[in-house]
């Protein structure tokens, strides 16, 4: 029986990748390597992280930073790809300036129902700073101890895609003294601003692809389901067995989904943005 290959867009897409919390631009390396060579990809550190000199801030200000990054790279319109917290940034940007966003791809994105008691505790005016500092000091230490035990038990080094959450936290505090403040600022924004991002979802005009693992332990799968219902033009795909960190644990699946999604959305050969 003949099979039909998914449509592939031949347009020169510009894609801006937004990492999660904590995270960095390097989280996207495995994904961008697998994308068509003629696509223009930008993966930069968000405010408060890595090489970005801007202080940590909320969703709206992060969105303005996205537009600044686009301007710096000569990109007029782009496809925004956001993971976790970065998904909230992508939604904020798409609702603020629909004319600059051609499509949105959300990987295990924050959204309705994702804020829990721990999030609210970390964002509280009195206890928040102390809890954030203690958590930032203790969690990496615990993670490194766990990673050492796992390495010993397996009698080999861990691969990049193994125990990703432990690996991310195990390296989170090394050489980045300001990160606990970034963590605190973003927790406060998550609690204070997420409802505003959700309220503006109806303003998102671009087509949206949502990717998530039903067994995600960090952002409930129900959050992705609610986003799919709220967004005017959304398509949901499951990525089973990858957990929360899809860019690292399932880069091939993510890249293939991106290519297929943009192929369906843009079948003409006219140039895109930029």
Spans of model-derived segments:
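Flexible "cap/lid" loop of the alpha/beta hydrolase fold
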Residues: 95, 104-136
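Active-site loop/oxyanion-hole signature of alpha/beta-hydrolase fold enzymes
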Residues: 43-85, 256
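Catalytic histidine-centered segment of alpha/beta-hydrolase-like enzymes
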Residues: 242-251, 255
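Conserved alpha/beta-hydrolase "nucleophile elbow" surrounding the catalytic nucleophile
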Residues: 19-21, 78, 82-84, 213
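Conserved HGGG/HGGXW glycine-rich cap/lid loop of the alpha/beta-hydrolase fold
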Residues: 6-51
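Acidic catalytic loop of the alpha/beta-hydrolase fold
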Residues: 191, 214-219
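Short beta-strand/loop motif that positions the catalytic acidic residue
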Residues: 204, 210-212
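Conserved alpha/beta-hydrolase catalytic His-Asp/Glu region
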Residues: 106, 115-117, 139-203
